[in-house]
A protein has these predicted regions:
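Methionine residue identity
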Residues: 1-3
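Short, Lys/Arg-enriched N-terminal segments with co-localized hydrophobic residues
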Residues: 18-29
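N-terminal Rossmann-like FAD-binding beta1-loop-alpha1 element of flavoenzymes
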Residues: 31-54
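N-terminal FAD cofactor-binding segment of flavoenzymes
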Residues: 47-52, 56-91
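Short beta-strand to alpha-helix junction loop
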Residues: 94-113
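Predominantly flavin-linked oxidoreductase catalytic cores and closely associated redox partners
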Residues: 122-233, 254
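A conserved FAD-binding loop/helix module that cradles the flavin
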Residues: 240-267
Length: 268
């Protein structure tokens, strides 16, 4: 039965149990809840939408905001699988030694639109309050938002892609780790990113960034591991900070697509 297969996966993937298990299952009409409005969540949602019903819960008002990821793709043709030529124009792609620079906020906007058009239920301004195992499903209780959406969801599979916030007082989802499969990534460290006009880059006093990504809109992103090491005399147009993988190779659209594919294959 479907539920027996899903429960086994949740138990053995739980971080509190040191077991390894490989289970192959084919399912249809699944109810899947994904916690966190990340790019990983959107890619997972589009995959599982083909098998049933998927709901994404995001605390913030929009998915992917505030931006905390470099606008970077290594092989821009990968976008053709997800976006129209008109949408790709919005990304402002430009070739760099570190990869193609792009506007990450538009990557997230387009991916959200594509997921919604495929039938994924997306609930912003929504926080998970609790979850409990019932006889044949996991019940998820959430807050309500201004759209008067449901606050109770029954799921066969729950995946968490969200990262714990480091902001003091910030509300968090309330998760039961024994009922949730975490989308585990590599060890995360703090990163700082700043955007400045390309005509102002580089400054002679600028320390070498770990990533430099110019875009065709006349702006350049510079990213360093750790805290902000330098501020340009004219200031930044925009700054980003958050926790990301310590490996630069992990920080691209392509790398995220590959990690999601690997994660899905590990469950099926």
């Amino acid at each position: 039965m479907l539920m027996k297969q899903i429960v086994l996966i949740v138990v053995f993937v739980s971080p509190h149990v040191l077991f390894s298990l490989s289970i192959s299952f084919q399912v249809i009409n699944m109810n899947v809840c994904i916690i966190g409005g990340t790019l990983e969540a959107l890619l997972l949602a589009m995959h599982y939408q083909e098998k049933g019903t998927v709901s994404i819960f995001e605390i913030d008002a929009e998915l992917g905001l505030p931006i905390s990821h470099p606008g970077r793709v290594l092989n821009p043709s990968i976008f053709n699988e997800y976006f129209s030529p008109q949408q790709i124009e919005f990304l402002k792609l430009s070739s760099n030694p570190d990869g193609w620079g792009c506007r990450w906020e538009w990557v997230m906007k387009h991916m959200t639109s594509v997921a919604a058009s495929k039938g994924v239920n997306i609930y912003p301004r929504t926080r998970v309050l609790s979850m409990e195992q019932l006889h044949d499903c996991i019940r998820v209780i959430t807050t309500n938002n201004e759209r008067h959406q449901p606050t109770q969801f029954d799921a066969d599979l729950i995946i968490s892609t969200h990262e714990e916030s480091t902001k003091p007082g910030r509300l968090q989802h309330v998760l039961d780790e024994s009922l949730t499969i975490p989308f585990k990534e590599q060890e995360h460290i703090p990163w700082f990113g700043g955007t400045l006009l390309t005509l102002h880059h580089p400054y002679p006093s600028m320390p070498k960034p770990a990533l430099t990504l110019s875009r065709s809109d006349g702006q350049t992103e510079v990213w360093w591991k750790g805290e902000c090491p330098w501020i340009p005399p004219a200031g930044y147009l925009e700054t980003c900070s958050g926790t990301l993988s310590s490996l630069v190779d992990d920080l691209s659209f392509d790398a995220i697509v590959q990690r999601v594919s690997d994660f899905i294959h590990s469950l099926e």
